[in-house]
Curated annotation (Swiss-Prot):
The protein contains a transactivation domain (TAD) which may be required for transcriptional activation of a subset of target genes. GO terms for cellular component: nucleus. Keywords: Nucleus, Phosphoprotein. This is Atos homolog protein B. It comes from Macaca fascicularis. The gene is ATOSB. Residues 436-444 are annotated as: Transactivation domain 1 (TAD1). Belongs to the ATOS family. Its main location: nucleus. The lineage of its organism: Eukaryota, Metazoa, Chordata, Craniata, Vertebrata. Residues 348-430 are annotated as: Required for macropage invasion.
Length: 538
């Protein structure tokens, strides 16, 4: 059983005029009924209230609409927009007019009816869903909308709200009170503008007769209503929509013309990731000489003053490395600083020669079979002795030079006193390879006549390859180390001199002095410590 209780009307005769709701015959069939109140209304001026309902399946009775009473007229009020403004101004809350639907026998619509209640004031849209057993009444519903003098006459609907030719409207209307938990704000799709039959139901509106901006229901500034939320309206009686720019996009306020944005200027220089033209094997040795990652990449065609300065600094850094790689033998320690350094460097930190003699390099292998014959001459001639030599080779091919051999002759088998020699004389050390062929004969002259008892010292004998004609004043950077002999001397408490500890040798894989085609010749240099020259025994 269906029952609808209608709101009693104060007058039995319908009033003609603008207070009559413009009800069309097809509104009942289409399930859409609209009420309109002109400007100057006392209770709810400028208000549309639309109710949409869905009848149950199989219901085909024609519906009739109740007429809405005309609200008493009242003087014009100040234009207020937005919910809650009337309450702040001290105005009493107002109730909009309602429209109801009745069946043929005065009965309401059946069970399962869902109604949607629309009030067009500041785009306030509320959906009401009734319960299954609730009866439909024409009670009033007061949205928190302030009064307005401007009456907007365009119904917000969609194209699918047109009347159904078959007489079964998919949408109907029947306003009524609903529980607060069943009020839902509809999606912004219902705010899209539509034209009824291609025309507006009212030609003009108040406030100077300005018209509502007409747009197609599917577009709003080139965007669909689903993706375009309503924005703040213009200074007119009706709100409008504005396009929202995507995130990260800023409007161009300087010019209205559309065109390509100006190209941003790129950075001047980047950061290098590796050396330009370097030996891959030498990276571990002279990587500290290369420019850091913050230095710019050098362009070969760059002729600017900055480019010339950078290339000049690069040449200063790499010049000692080029001379280091060109040498055929062992090289003297190169200068790692681009500024000029003294000809004689006394530092031993990081020295290639000292590192080899002290065993700081990891050996790559050992060779057995080398021997050394030791002899001396002077005030007396001690007996010659032959001792084995422990030969170790190293892999220093990143220096682009022949890998040297380190030979160590242990003198401990000769006793605690070592190999006795005169205080002034010559020491001869002959090195033999496993085939018993002479590799090199060293002759070292010494004079330790002023050496006190219980002291010690050493001699370091070097053989360099120097350019021909520069024997006397050869530049240390032009000398190539070929052989080295390190001897340790010690004086006993009685004043006798002897070789002790061990004898260390550095030699090349091949005999460089036999290569007559090289424009170099051998030069022997013997060095001893000074200041102090002798050190006391521990």
């Amino acid at each position: 059983m269906r029952h609808v209780q209608a709101e009693p009307s104060p007058s039995s005769e319908p009033e003609a005029g603008p207070s009559q709701p413009p009800v069309r015959q097809g509104a009942l069939q289409g399930g859409l009924l609209m009420g309109y109140s002109p400007a100057g209304g006392a209770t709810s001026p400028g208000v549309y209230q639309v109710s949409i309902f869905s009848p149950p399946a199989g219901t085909s009775e024609p519906h009739r609409a109740l007429k809405r009473q005309a609200p008493p007229t009242e003087g014009p009020r100040e234009l207020k927009r937005g919910p809650g403004l009337g309450a702040r101004e001290g105005l009493p809350p107002e109730e909009p007019s309602t429209v109801g639907l009745l069946g043929p026998e005065g009965l309401g619509l059946g069970l399962g009816v869902a109604s949607q209640h629309f009030s067009h004031r500041g785009l306030c849209v509320v959906e009401q869903r009734s319960s299954v057993t609730s009866s439909w009444t024409s009670g009033t519903w007061s949205p928190p909308c302030p009064p307005s003098n401007a009456s907007c006459n365009t119904l917000h609907t969609r194209d699918w709200a047109s009347p159904d030719p078959g007489g079964h409207g998919s949408l109907g209307e029947s306003p009524g009170p609903a529980p607060p938990g069943q009020l839902h704000t509809l999606d912004t799709d219902l705010h899209s503008l539509a034209q009824i039959g291609g025309k507006s139901p009212v030609a003009g509106v108040g406030n100077g007769g300005s018209l509502w901006p007409r747009e197609s229901p599917g577009t709003a500034n080139g965007h669909s209503p689903e993706h375009t939320p309503p924005g703040p309206g213009p200074p007119g009686p009706c709100p409008t929509k504005r396009r929202l720019l995507p995130a990260g996009e800023a409007p161009d306020v300087s010019s209205e013309e559309e065109g390509p944005a100006p190209r941003r200027r790129r950075g001047s220089l980047g950061h290098p990731t590796a050396a330009n033209s370097s030996d891959a094997k030498a990276t571990s040795f002279w990587s500290h000489l290369l420019p850091g990652p913050k230095e710019p990449v050098l362009d070969p065609t760059d002729c600017s003053p900055m480019g010339r300065r950078l290339k000049g600094a690069r040449r200063l850094k790499l010049s000692p490395l080029r001379s280091l790689r060109k040498g055929p033998g062992l090289l003297s320690p190169p200068s790692a600083s681009p500024v000029p350094t003294p000809a004689v460097s006394r530092t031993l930190l990081g020295n290639f020669e000292e590192s080899l003699l002290r065993g700081r390099f990891a050996p790559s292998g050992h060779i057995e079979g080398f021997t050394a014959e030791i002899g001396a001459s002077g005030s007396y001639c001690p007996q010659h002795v032959t001792l084995p030599v422990t030969v170790t080779f190293f892999d220093v091919s990143e220096q682009n030079a022949p890998a040297p051999f380190l030979g160590i002759v242990d003198l401990n088998p000769l006793g605690r006193k070592g190999y006795s020699v005169p205080k002034v004389g010559t020491v001869q050390v002959t090195l033999f390879n496993p085939n018993q062929t002479v590799v090199k004969m060293f002759l070292v002259t010494f004079d330790f006549s002023d050496m006190p008892a219980a002291h010690m010292t050493f001699l370091r004998h070097r053989l360099f390859l120097v350019p021909v004609g520069e024997e006397g004043n050869a530049n240390p950077t032009h000398r190539l180390l070929c052989y080295l002999l390190h001897l340790r001397f010690r004086s006993s408490r009685s004043g006798r001199l002897s070789l002790h500890g061990d004898i260390r040798l550095l030699f090349s894989r091949r005999s460089l002095e036999l290569d007559t085609g090289l424009p170099y010749e051998l030069q022997a240099v013997t060095e001893a410590p000074h200041n102090p020259r002798y050190s006391p025994l521990p």
